[in-house]
């Protein structure tokens, strides 16, 4: 899996947590999130810890650092522009209320729409493809179709090429 895919998956995971339990301080929440990701990866490599065992985290790997560098601006941007992004979702999600949508799908959409609207260095078709794959991985097979349908409508409204970087 590429670093950018991994970063997007982590971004969706953080946005999901943020959506369901907004932290008082986003910076602290991000630091805790990245530490928990590293702890989970270490436990996967090392095996389960015993009670009372203290685990000292090694420095982040180059791949972990690259994922964080790519993901954090996406996370912060999606949070900063959430109201506008949610309006796009409401406009195109016919017969769906935002709060009734699966939380995973809602946050996959938020991330992808942020990329499509504000990240001209990422072609919209890349954002759509990544969002569909992440929705299928973390939600349901039907989520991929749902996410694709909404994002395709938004792509049609963009004032930039779908396959090119500006």
Segments predicted by a language model, with ranges:
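N-terminal interaction/assembly modules
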Residues: 1-166
